[in-house]
């Protein structure tokens, strides 16, 4: 199907920003120029809007198989398209976990049949994600995983982690690690500090993240594996990764929108939708994380989309599930708090949310002639009020509910097909 995007400000991901038209035919970008004329096809007017490479989320929980009451591949990818994502990498903490080629094929087949955007499976490091026996990496890679991770179940044994990294290096697989020392995090549920003491909740010290991160950096340097650090949250973690990069360690890192914008002060009213791992930290940490993005220490912004049922969250804070539903608010949150305030540019947003995560995962991204037409059109200035009840995701667990944000996804195009288009007749900005 032929399509033309007219008069948008195209940020291609390669340094260029210009008002232009984009001609798409059979899912491929055929031309980028001014005043392109065609006799047939779909015409999208992008006047006053940015036309960007589709966002790539390298940390999504789609929950299927096993936890379909929280999310399915269908609802999760619908949420992704609504948020401007054209590709998501799904974590292996399903039931059964993505720890063998059969489950990989299941996820791929459901995604092919019911998915709205492209889904890249991440395989488990250990069988059953129990941290005991290494998975068959060669079979997982052949089946199509883009990385290995035990997600929120950190490998506590340094010896086992070294063996995993050694095999990972052998098969050229990206290792994604959740850095948490369970002996330090214990039963903590929020950032350890003044506020946790004031409101009587058990704290998670920053050392729980930083000690495990330091260990994994040492092992990555020793083995030469490609290491990616999931959702960092502390100033100390930024410093450790910066130093590791300076020493030539093959390391990349991501940070979430909520850890870039919210502090532990948001937990004051015991809203369980603020409960995530890692926890919301302090203003000093946020400033360090933003600086880490700016200087290249942190490579990507990832949602860690973790949908839960209402029952998972409608309990006392210390009993509530960790996790935030983030696919549908990520762009708006980053645009509102970082771009519109001048902390980062829209070009940098494109790097953090599209170009860099794609590069880390080994896939293509960017707008150029001959490339696949994975595109998002956004209005960076339109405002709206977040309404969790309008989420496509089954997970309504967002700390941004009721917040006025600036920046709206207008259209998401995957391989030349419109997968989401904002209905401006029915969706009004709440006043």
Swiss-Prot record:
An example molecular function term from Gene Ontology annotations: allantoinase activity
Residues engaged in binding substrate: 61-63, 93, 308, 322-323
CDD domains: DHOase_IIa
Pfam families linked to this entry: Amidohydro_1 (PF01979)
Transmembrane segments: none
Annotated function: Catalyzes the reversible cyclization of carbamoyl aspartate to dihydroorotate.
Protein name: Dihydroorotase
Annotated organism of origin: Thermoanaerobacter pseudethanolicus (strain ATCC 33223 / 39E)
